[in-house]
């Protein structure tokens, strides 16, 4: 079952907080806290859009996946691909994948992001 509150908390604990912590520990200057916040905002927009689907069907769910992946691609590209690295990639993928399934995705590919993802 899709629990928006739980997923919103996961954005913070599994994606944005770890990136910010790494950024500070490693003294990263390739991106800013605002860039990390934008990444979180894109994920929140995705989760909110899923929660607002009245009768979720695969096409509508996958349209939201495509939209967020393309937006994340654009954000990451603008930062010379520095924001979304291996650890972040896995956390973001897992969040997008499980949210799509919990929202009601029936024909579940191994990776819902694969078709569009550049990170």
Segments and roles (model prediction):
Residues 1-10, 58-59, 112-117:
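A broad, low-amplitude sensor of folded, mature protein cores
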Residues 1-51:
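Short terminal alpha-helical segments
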Residues 12, 36, 74, 82-83, ...:
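Alpha-helical interaction segments
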Residues 14-17, 25-26, 49, 53-56, ...:
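Surface-exposed polar/charged interaction patches
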Residues 35, 54-61, 81-88:
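Residue-level recognition of alpha-helical structural elements
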Residues 37-40, 44, 66-73, 90, ...:
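Generic structural signal for well-ordered, non-transmembrane alpha-helical segments
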Residues 43-75:
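Mature extracytoplasmic domains of secretory-pathway proteins
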Residues 79-119:
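Amphipathic alpha-helical binding modules
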């Amino acid at each position: 079952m899709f629990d928006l509150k739980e997923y919103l908390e996961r954005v913070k604990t599994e994606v944005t907080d770890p990136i910010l912590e790494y950024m500070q520990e490693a003294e990263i200057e390739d991106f800013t806290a605002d860039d990390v916040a934008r990444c979180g905002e894109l994920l929140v927009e995705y989760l909110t859009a899923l929660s607002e689907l009245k009768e979720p069907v695969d096409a509508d769910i996958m349209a939201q996946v495509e939209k967020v992946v393309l937006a994340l691609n654009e954000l990451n590209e603008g930062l010379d691909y520095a924001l979304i690295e291996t650890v972040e990639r896995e956390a973001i993928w897992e969040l997008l994948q499980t949210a799509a399934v919990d929202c009601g995705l029936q024909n579940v590919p191994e990776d819902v992001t694969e078709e569009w993802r550049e990170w």
